[in-house]
Structures are given as structure tokens and as C-alpha cells.
Amino acid sequence: YDANSYFLSAEKKINAKHSISLTTFGAPVKKGMQSAATQEAYDLLDDNFYNSAWGYQDGKVRNSKVKTSFEPTTLLTHVFDINAKTKLTSTAGFTFGRTGTTALNWYNSADPRPDYYHYMPSYQTDQSMIDAYTNAWQNDESVSQINWNKLYQINYLANYMGEQAKYIIEERRVDMKQYVFASYINHDLNKHTFLSGGLDVRSYTGRNYKVISDMLGGNYWVDVDQFAERDFSGDTVTSQNDLNNPNRVVKEGDTYGYDYESH
């Protein structure tokens, strides 16, 4: 977990009726995330805080699910004291930034999640296999956690065979911009009653997309939907994520999968 924050503000009193202020603040955050787990996994490890999202890579802990966000905001405010009973406050603001969460993705290969149900003792039917899986879960962290070195070795083999990477780290991104204008007026009718009204206008644009964050030693990735390949076998059109560029080859830093705007 790594987080910082800042807040800066300055105000200028123009005269008895008018003042303006400028405020900016933000909080860049980077944190490892938790994956959902089953009671079986908790019981095997005697640990209700078990998190299957991490594992050791060259002796160091690495989390596959890391969230980063930074959305700084700037506000310009004008205060107008119309008279002793009436005040008008207007603010124009701008927020921009990005939020992204990484995750493992894989193609035509074994599920890399250590708590995938096929890898659990409860999935086994032979008692000797149940005992073996139970022992491995309780005594070998390369079984109960992500085996990063294994994923790299599988990708190196794919490189040698001239095939696409079997495992990658993707980042699911939302890059946003938001403009805000708000104006509020308050008027005191008497000691016990006041009137308040205002206007609030907002414009939001968010770009939602995926990007390859880490090839995990692989050479390339083909931008197709493997679930569509499975469900519509033989249909080479439905499986394409980008119909304008079928079977597009993508690498680290490239956008793939989906890319659209929300408003």
C-alpha cells in the first residue's frame, strides 16, 4: 500500500462584496487487492485472511491485483455578497485522472489461480489424491499462492515454439475528465426563514479500456475473445475484439480487448 495526498488553497478578498479562491487537491494511491476465496481454502491454511492474488517471484512477493488511482481536482470559487441578507456562491471545477486495476489473463493454458476449483482437495475423487493435495496446500506456498516463475517458464516455452504468450498481466483502466459548474444563492427572509436555490451542471467523459501491463516474458498476444472462440467454434468473426484489425498482434503497453467512452 502506497498513498500520498496534497491540498492547496488560496483566497483573494477583492473588496467588501467579492472574493475568489483557488483550491486544488489529490491523492495518488497504489495498493494490492484481495481476491475472493472459499471456506475450503481458509480451512486448509487455517487463515481467514488468505489471499490467492499474490505469490513469490524470485523470492519477492508480487500481487497480481494492484489498483492505482490519481484523480486531482481544481476548483475556482467566487463569492458575491449581494447585500447583508443575500449571498451568491459560484464554483467552476475540473477533475481528471485515471484508475486502473491489474489482473492475470491467460489463453489456451491452465488456470493460474491457485484456488481454482480443479486444484482443490475437494475436487479430487481418490483418497490418496485428496491427501496429496491437502498436504501440498498446507506445506507448499508455490501451490497455495501464484507460481510466478512457472508462468514465466511457460511463456518462454511459447516463445520457443513461436506461439503467443500464455499468460499476461492486463490493466483495466478508466481515464476520466469531469467539468463542473455550480452556483447557489442564499437569502435570509428573517431570523427563522431563508431561501436557497441553485444550478449544478456537470460534464463527464470516461475512457474504459484494457492495456497489457506485463507480457511476463512472452513475445506477443493476439487480440481475440477466447470465450467467443469457445462458444462459437469455427466462427472467426465473432471472436474478434477489433473487426477492423482481425487477429491483431499486441504487446506490452498496447490497448486490447475493449475500448469505449462513457458519458
Per-range role (PLM):
Residues 9, 19-23, 46, 87-89, ...:
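Residue-level detector of the transmembrane beta-barrel scaffold of outer-membrane proteins
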Residues 1-2, 11-17, 82:
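Outer-membrane beta-barrel pore proteins
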Residues 19-77, 100-174, 234-251:
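Acidic/polar loop-and-plug regions of large Gram-negative outer-membrane beta-barrel proteins
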Residues 60-103, 164-200, 207-208, 252-263:
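Outer-membrane beta-barrel transmembrane strands
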Residues 1, 11, 23-25, 91-93, ...:
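Transmembrane beta-strands of outer-membrane beta-barrel proteins
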Residues 168, 193-263:
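Signature of Gram-negative outer-membrane beta-barrel scaffolds
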